[in-house]
Every structure is written in structure tokens, then in C-alpha cells.
């Protein structure tokens, strides 16, 4: 599954809107929107914040990380 779909499904499973999710991760609503629309992908700093959020809430991080890494490989960003 593309990262954009993974991150959107994750946010929805947390019952958050884009603004709330962005606030939880320390990014803007616009940033979350761009991730979900496939126009941008999180930088490493945002992925670390996402991992911390998952750990604090007892949520699985691995599917998000896997999708993010696969997306980076496909784009040649490794």
C-alpha cells in the first residue's frame, strides 16, 4: 500500500482530523494533507515523531515505516 494511504488509514484509526494529527506530531495540517495526497513524504524527523507517538499510544509503527521505506526506495531517495 502506498505510504499516502497508510498514513491516512493510520490517522483515521486514531479518530483524528488532519489538524489534530499534525499537532500530535508537531507538523502542520498542510503537511499532513500533503502526505496523504502523495505530494510529499515525511522527513526523518517527522518519522521519529510518528514512532514516538505510536510507542506512547501502543500503536503499531512497523507498517508505516515499511511503507515509508518502500516509497523512498521507489523514488530513489535512499
Task: Give the residues covered by each predicted segment.
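Short, charged recognition helix plus adjacent turn
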Residues: 44, 61-78
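A detector for short, charged/polar N-terminal pre-domain segments
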Residues: 1-2
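DNA major-groove recognition helix of helix-turn-helix/homeodomain DNA-binding modules
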Residues: 43-63
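Short basic helix-loop element that most often maps to the first helix and adjoining turn
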Residues: 5-20, 49
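Short Asp/Glu-rich motifs
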Residues: 30, 41, 73
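Short alpha-helical DNA-recognition segment
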Residues: 15-34
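Residue-level detection of the helix-turn-helix DNA-binding "recognition helix"
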Residues: 12, 26, 37-39, 55
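Residue-level recognition of specific faces of alpha-helices
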Residues: 6, 31-34, 46
Amino acid at each position: 500500500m502506498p505510504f499516502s494511504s497508510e498514513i491516512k488509514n493510520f490517522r483515521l484509526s486514531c479518530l483524528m482530523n488532519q489538524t489534530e494529527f499534525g499537532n500530535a506530531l508537531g507538523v502542520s495540517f498542510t503537511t499532513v494533507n500533503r502526505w496523504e495526497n502523495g505530494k510529499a513524504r515525511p522527513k526523518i524527523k517527522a518519522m521519529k515523531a510518528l514512532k514516538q507517538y505510536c510507542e506512547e499510544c501502543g500503536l503499531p509503527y512497523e507498517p508505516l515505516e515499511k511503507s515509508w521505506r518502500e516509497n523512498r526506495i521507489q523514488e530513489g531517495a535512499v
